[in-house]
Each structure stands twice: as C-alpha cells, then as structure tokens.
Design a protein with these regions (language model features):
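Bacterial carbohydrate/catabolite-sensing allosteric modules
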Residues: 1-143
C-alpha cells in the first residue's frame, strides 16, 4: 500500500541519517494480521534483532506470541512496538507500546477529502501527528 511504502521510505531515510546499515533482511513485509508474524519473527530473531517495529498492533501481538514461542521475553530480550493503539493493545501481556493515530481527526480528513473530490475540488495533503504511547513491551537499548 501507499502507507506501507511511505513508512518504508521513512525507515530508510532515518537509517541513512544515522549512518546505519540498510538491508532488505531487516524489512520483511507481510499481511497486517497477527498470524503473519509467524512468517518473519523467527528470522528476525535469528539475525539478532533486539527490537521489532510492526505496522500495526495486530501484527505486534503476533510478534509477542512468536517471541515467546522461541524462548524470548518481551521486553527483556526483545522490544516490540505496534501502530494504531487499538483497544486490546493495553490489555496484551505485556501491554503494547504503540503509536496512536487520532481516529476522529483521521475520519474528518477522510470526509473532507471525499467531499472535495465529489465537488471537483483538489485535495490537499494533511499530515496528522501521531502520539507514542509507551507501555511495557519496550525496554531501553541494550549496550
């Protein structure tokens, strides 16, 4: 999707800005469902990943399960972060650190964009500012 590609590009730009290695092996792609974590988490762990950033909270919940299945503790061994802050995120074990989007504002932007398109008015870009919700699935970087 366009959003996935934008997130990927932001990741690459951030890695470049900090002179860090960029490799496809660190950027697996899968469906945005918990079961998709099975396809990638074991490989990331075998590469020595100490943190996994997931495209949404469902994928992050699956990543937590997969880490446990492979004997890793979250967050002691691996930090996991999601995106969306769906209601179940705070109830996971451990509660999931995530990025919250303002759903009301997102809905308003969608409405105004659709209204503009219906009325043949060009649609402008809106950048919504997400909020990092720190819970217990992340820990400080290990040295």
């Amino acid at each position: 999707s366009m959003i996935t590609e934008q997130r990927r590009q932001a990741y690459i730009e951030s890695m470049n800005a900090h002179d860090l290695e960029i490799s496809e092996k660190w950027m697996p792609y899968g469906y945005y469902v918990a079961a998709a974590a099975k396809d990638h988490v074991a490989n990331l762990l075998s590469l020595g990943a100490s943190a996994i950033v997931c495209g949404n909270d469902l994928l992050a919940s699956g990543a937590i399960d997969e880490c446990r299945a492979h004997g890793y503790r979250v967050p002691e061994d691996v930090s996991i972060i999601g995106f969306d802050d769906i209601p179940i995120s705070a109830q996971l074990n451990p509660p999931l650190t995530t990025v919250r989007q303002d759903r009301i504002e997102l809905g308003k932007c969608g409405f105004f964009a659709l209204h503009s398109l219906i009325n043949h008015v060009s649609v402008s870009k809106n950048l919504l500012r997400p909020q990092l919700i720190i819970r217990n699935s992340t820990a400080p970087v290990r040295k």
